[in-house]
Amino acid sequence: MKLGIIGLCPIAVNMSRNMIENGIEVWGYSIVDYESACEKYEKGYISGCVTSLEYLVQTVKSDGLGHTSAGKVPGIFQMIIPEPKIEDTLDELIPLLDEGDIIIDHSSNDIKKCQELEKYCSKLGISYIFVGVYGATHAINACSKIFAHTIAPTRMPT
């Protein structure tokens, strides 16, 4: 199983490390600094890094042999980015996604905006899940467990 993580702040890196320890392949994209993403990859904090959201979506939805699984297996994308970057990131990400894909938002976004995003994404067949735990260190394990035990088994083949 693999997913894409957008934003590589310390909380994102810790979540990624936890998921990697549990057998999940985590590809990272930094909205700020590709070199920093490469350093995190070299340290083993992420499974790989990409230079754009487009490449992240392609990587998460490929089988490693160059074949895309778009429409067959949902792509799962976690966002852990500052509130001012959310709108631009989603404007770029959503058109790249397909029905059945999942966005998990760990940002500090306003709840009303998140409710609007959930409605908009649901019309496209995309699941938008607002977790709203940005900055809470105890949430790292909880969110990873939610993903690994709830979302992954019901949405992803083993």
Label every PLM stretch briefly.
Residues 31-34, 41-64, 70-113, 144-148:
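Rossmann-like NAD(P)-binding element
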Residues 8, 21, 29:
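Short coil/turn segments
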Residues 16, 20:
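Gly/Ala-rich phosphate-binding loop of Rossmann-like dinucleotide-binding domains
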Residues 1-2, 21-22, 101-104:
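A short, structure-level motif marking secondary-structure boundaries and short turns
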Residues 3-8, 13, 87-91, 110-158:
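Rossmann-fold dinucleotide-binding core
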